[in-house]
From Swiss-Prot:
CDD domains registered for this protein in UniProt: Gnk2-like (cd23509)
Domain of life, source organism: Eukaryota
Subcellular location: Secreted
Keywords of this entry: Repeat, Secreted, Signal
Main localization, broad class: secreted
One cellular-component annotation, GO: extracellular region
Family from the record: Belongs to the cysteine-rich repeat secretory protein family.
UniProt source species: Arabidopsis thaliana (Mouse-ear cress)
Signal peptide as annotated in the record: 1-32
One Pfam family here: Stress-antifung
InterPro entries referenced in this protein's UniProt entry, alphabetically: CRR_secretory_protein (IPR050581), GNK2 (IPR002902), GNK2_sf (IPR038408)
Protein name: Putative cysteine-rich repeat secretory protein 40
């Protein structure tokens, strides 16, 4: 007696479905922890012009790239600037608060490679990934103003899906969480590697949902007293960028925030607010 055709089909489909379920679970876990380093956005600073192959600018640029690549990436943030126009070069990077050492190094390398490919021979450009941003500019050491917040390069991203239930309450509670994290990021007791962290993460129960969030400022350039001002400014843009969205962020070069309905950071130090 032979098994029926339908039975054979079920026997064939069962291991296949089990494999698919396993893969989906794996993908979900990777996504929730954000283990990938997804490209987000870039901006070529075309007003700064282009450099010629073999020029002094290219020599200085490559020297800076190699110097920063040889660092330990322990602080997650660094900048290097030297020279005067037309050969002034500044490179800076900022890694996400949970992406230090090797993770930060690999993101920096991806940023440099991405700028070379997307903004070929541009003297200036910025690229954002999930775990860092990298900027190259021809601004001279004299003109490089570390006491000014840069809002020009801010841009929003959001999840297209909307939350269910009381959207107004969700918006208010999520903004309240971001504001609390902004205060925490600027707390003088919030230190990392001998410097103010200018970074904070946390989570909060909002109705039946749990919101996970983080805020961060560019440690190597933004003065601590400016971080709060920068974060307050972009959090005010929440209604325009993220109204009722299941996740959203505003990215820039001075500060940024992000929130999701799932955990997206590697660190386990998030505290329920």
């Amino acid at each position: 007696m032979y098994p029926s055709c339908s039975l054979l089909q079920r026997l064939v489909w069962f291991p296949f479905l089990a494999l698919v379920a396993t893969q989906l679970l794996f993908i979900r876990n990777v996504s929730s922890l954000n283990l990938t380093n997804e490209y987000l956005h870039h901006k070529c600073l075309v007003s700064e012009g282009k450099y010629k192959p073999g020029s002094k600018y290219e020599y200085i640029l490559n020297d800076h790239i190699r110097f920063l690549a040889a660092g330990n990436f322990r602080s997650g943030s660094m900048h290097m600037t030297s020279g005067l126009k037309p050969n002034a070069v500044t490179i800076l990077y900022q890694c996400r608060g949970d992406s230090y050492n090797s993770k930060c190094r690999s993101c920096y390398a991806a940023g440099i490679s991405g700028l070379r490919r997307r903004c070929p021979r541009n003297k200036g450009g910025i690229i954002w990934f999930d775990q860092c941003f990298v900027e190259i500019t021809s601004i001279s050491v004299i003109d490089f103003n570390i006491s000014k917040i840069n809002y020009e390069n801010n841009f929003p991203l959001h999840n297209p899906n909307r939350v269910s239930g009381d959207i107004k309450s969700f918006n208010n509670e999520t903004m309240a969480l971001l504001k609390e994290l902004a205060l925490k990021a600027n707390n003088k007791d919030n230190m990392d590697n001998g410097k103010m962290a200018l970074y904070a993460s946390g989570e909060k129960r909002v109705g039946t949902k749990k919101v996970y969030a983080m805020v961060q400022c560019m440690r190597d350039l933004v003065k601590p007293k400016m971080c709060k001002e920068c974060l307050e400014s972009i959090i005010k843009e929440f209604p325009e960028c993220c109204d009722g969205k299941q996740g959203g962020r505003i990215l820039g070069t001075s500060c940024d925030f992000r929130y999701e309905l799932y955990p997206f950071l590697r660190t386990s130090d998030s505290k329920t607010v």
